[in-house]
């Protein structure tokens, strides 16, 4: 594939912050190209926790990952005539010549006047449970993310983990599953205090500190999980219909070193205008790093218009690019 069209702004990453940035760029009259390495848009909320309840999005007392992405896509559809989407493409390098970036991907190349990086911390993969025969049961009834709470109705569910996702899934499944057991290798959980309070008020069987030892099952179907109490000989075999491993996800921004921008670990250093060290390239959301950074979707949503407006000013330095309110830009 060779893309000859020159876009105003290319957004690397199709998660919630990238989708919002694309909408805002469309609102400002820009042509936009979204390049996403995965097979669908939405990033982690869509793929890892579509049914997980989210409470910290402004004006939404409660939503889910799936609902959030669905609404962002509906919003973006308004500008479908000026927004292109390329899925399953990994951005490898980009280089500017005569004011135009040539973006090389795993499928070909794209041309753009400016780039906004919104790829979070890069590609992600689940951290394993760490027992010998784990792969025998993976993605059967041993799961690393939850797509539907209904799939656990009436089942004996064991969850391994101690962070926000593990505690949240335990709380959400309480009352849906026949039983829920949460095991964690430490006494204290790393989740939000309120979520932990709800956990101990629920009927979830909390087992701490325990570590997984062995999965038993037949024909790829896990039937029990054996756990051992830390610093003890006590061993417990837990019957399971479903095992959810919630040890978090490892991320990989391996191509970052080829993008010619300053970065620390897996995040790109930006200034107050979300400019990177390379002129015409901006970074927002989980991809951006600056003093006082808070890694929340809501924060990334606020960063996006700033970066887009800076990109427009870069593209059209002599243009009338002063930001205006959306009510002045959209006529129903």
From Swiss-Prot:
Tell me the Pfam families matching this sequence.
Answer: Pyr_redox_2 (PF07992)
Please give the InterPro entries that the UniProt record associates with this protein: FAD/NAD-bd_sf, FAD/NAD-binding_dom, Fd--NADP_Rdtase_type_2, Ferredoxin-NADP_redctase_2
Reaction catalysed? 2 reduced [2Fe-2S]-[ferredoxin] + NADP(+) + H(+) = 2 oxidized [2Fe-2S]-[ferredoxin] + NADPH
Q: Does the keyword Oxidoreductase apply?
A: yes
| Keyword set, alphabetical order | FAD, Flavoprotein, NADP, Oxidoreductase
What EC numbers are recorded for this enzyme?
1.18.1.2
The cofactor required is: FAD
Origin superkingdom? Bacteria
Positions with a binding annotation for FAD: 36, 44, 49, 91, 124, 327
Co-factor binding comment: Binds 1 FAD per subunit.
Identify the SUPFAM superfamilies for this entry: FAD/NAD(P)-binding domain
Q: Name one GO molecular function term.
A: flavin adenine dinucleotide binding
Family, according to the entry, reads as follows:
Belongs to the ferredoxin--NADP reductase type 2 family.
Q: Which PANTHER family match?
A: THIOREDOXIN REDUCTASE 1-RELATED-RELATED (PTHR48105)
The protein's matches in HAMAP family, at most eight in alphabetical order, are given as: FENR2
Q: What's the subunit arrangement here?
A: Homodimer.
Q: What is this protein called?
A: Ferredoxin--NADP reductase
